[in-house]
Every structure is written in structure tokens, then in C-alpha cells.
Amino acid sequence: MSGFLNAREVAKRMVARERGTIIFTGATASIRGAANFAAFSGAKMALRALAQSMARELGPRGVHIAHVIIDGMIDTEFIRTNFPEGYAKKQQDGILNPDHIADQYWMLHCQPRDAWTHELDLRPWMEKF
């Protein structure tokens, strides 16, 4: 619900200016459910549908809407502390670097309107998909 409410409010100003970017962050669960993840998967799938609908509605009005699927662990203190076996993959570029994710978000924001990306999957090279 927060994705919808926040996007609705900022979209009003962006539509008035005929420009802007809204990026929703999804997960693997945005496209594939898993056992014991029904609530999370349902919410992420709904967020993806919201992004797709808003892209179709607001794109023609100059607002770029993108959905980014983050498919893998992100190098954070939480991961380092709670998932040391996952963090060990860092040595092989096996977890996502937050700065590299930010670079991709900035790239989406800077895209020219004639070549907008509406969905982007970010995953380490060794992550299964």
C-alpha cells in the first residue's frame, strides 16, 4: 500500500511538470512465488502490477515508471551479520554491491524518453534464475 500511496502523491507533481521518474523495487518474488512466502510474493507481484499499470497510465504523460527486480543478497551489515555463508560469496562478486545498484537506478532516471526501460533484473552473475 505504501508504494501506491507514495507514487500517487509524487506522480501528481511529476504529471504537472510532464517529467519525472518513479522506481519500484521488487524481488525474485515479483515474478515467482515460493513455499512459505505467500504473503511476500503476493505483495511483490502486486507491486509489479502497480508499476506496469502506472507506466501505461503515466508514461504518455512524461513520467517514467520502472520496476527493478533485485535477485540476490545485497552487501549490507544485516547480511554480513546474519548470513555469513552468503556474504562469503562476495569474494566471487556473488552478492550485489549497493553502489552498483544505485548506479543502475541513476541510469534508469537519466534515460531518454525514446528508450525507457520499464523493468530491470539485477542479479549477481552466479545467481540462478
Residue ranges of each PLM-predicted region?
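C-terminal helical subdomain
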Residues: P60-I69, Y87-F129
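Helix-to-beta-strand junctions that scaffold the AdoMet/dcAdoMet cofactor pocket
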Residues: M14-R17, G59
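Short beta-loop-alpha junction of Rossmann-like oxidoreductase domains
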Residues: N36, V63, H67-N82
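Catalytic loop of short-chain dehydrogenase/reductase
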Residues: T21-A46, A51-Q52, R56-P60, I74
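A short, exposed helix-loop element centered on a Lys and neighboring polar residues
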Residues: A7-R8, Q52
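A structural motif corresponding to the C-terminal end of an alpha-helix
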Residues: E9-V10, P112
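Conserved internal alpha-helix in NAD(P)-dependent oxidoreductase domains
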Residues: M1-L5, R17-G20
